[in-house]
Amino acid sequence: MVYIINMNTILNALAEPNRLQIVELLRDGSLTVGEITDKLGMNQPQVSKHLRVLSEAGLVEVQPIANRRYYKLKAEPLKEMNEWVQSFQKLWEDRFDRLDDYLQELQRKKKNKRSE
């Protein structure tokens, strides 16, 4: 049950477009609030609020270096989310296989009608 609660927290955090953009920026490496602000054209309080939500969801961590705070992605929650999504892969594959079988059957019927 903890797994589902954690996944809900992560998905809720990522559902907001600005937070998703921040995660995409951090994918390429650590950034300060100021750097994120410049790249997104948002004001500093907005970015800080979004970073706090991402941090509370466990997606981002802070590294203080000298007088700056660098934000970076935490790999583990993203790995968990990837595993969760992959758990649906068998379902998708089965459905695509059934669809393929159905389409092949339709083609066979169509060919049989033409030959009659």
Mark where each language-model region is.
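C-terminal regulatory/oligomerization modules of transcriptional regulators
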Residues: M1-N8, L25-K39, Q44, E56-E61, ...
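Short helix-coil-helix linker/hinge
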Residues: A13-N18
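Short, hydrophobic-biased segments on the C-terminal half of alpha helices
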Residues: L51-R52
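Short, Lys/Arg-rich nucleic-acid/phosphate-binding segment
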Residues: P64-Y70
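Pre-recognition alpha-helix immediately N-terminal to the DNA-recognition helix
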Residues: L20-I22
